[in-house]
């Protein structure tokens, strides 16, 4: 089993923590996107793009309701950032998590995963995210509510149509 598949399974397993909190799979994927962005900035030594005091380690070093309230404020502050990319990622961001203990558990689990094994592999993090989107799509009414297009089909359509730069293909 590849490390990406293993990590996707672990991340998807964490969704069960939030299911009882009323968080849908689609909301979980969005929540995970925010947390993984913060974690990977830390892992890659790119924390400097984030405002001081609003970085992964600042979040990890808090627990319970203090962490929960900080996370909510953090999402707002990052959405108000003057940095174009941060603002676009976090604009109008909010958390769907209601219980502070669930956020703490999720952050602890994410922090304990072995990211080094996949981050430098070809397609590593992109494949990880694609795996999560696929699982979300497969959840039917509770998930994305749409069909997930398998990578093999996407590659075949691209190969057969031979799109030029700037052209768009819809599936």
Task: Please state what every model-predicted region is.
Residues 1-165:
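Non-catalytic, mostly N-terminal accessory regions of nucleic-acid modification and defense proteins
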Residues 171:
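Class I SAM-dependent methyltransferase core
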């Amino acid at each position: 089993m590849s490390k990406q598949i293993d990590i996707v399974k672990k991340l998807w397993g964490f969704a069960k923590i939030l299911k009882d909190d009323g968080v849908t799979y689609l909301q979980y994927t969005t929540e995970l996107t925010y947390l993984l962005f913060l974690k990977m900035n830390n892992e890659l030594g790119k924390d400097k793009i984030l405002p001081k005091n609003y970085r992964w380690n600042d979040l990890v070093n808090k627990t319970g309701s203090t962490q929960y309230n900080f996370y909510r404020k953090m999402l707002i502050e990052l959405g108000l950032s003057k940095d174009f990319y941060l603002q676009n990622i976090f604009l109008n961001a909010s958390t769907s998590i209601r219980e502070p203990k669930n956020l703490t558990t999720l952050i602890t689990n994410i922090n304990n995963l072995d990211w080094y094994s996949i981050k430098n592999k070809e397609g590593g993090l992109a494949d990880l995210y694609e795996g999560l989107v696929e699982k979300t799509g497969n959840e039917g009414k509770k998930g994305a509510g749409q069909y997930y297009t398998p990578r093999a089909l996407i590659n075949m359509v691209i190969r057969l149509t031979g799109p030029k730069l700037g052209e768009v293909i819809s599936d």
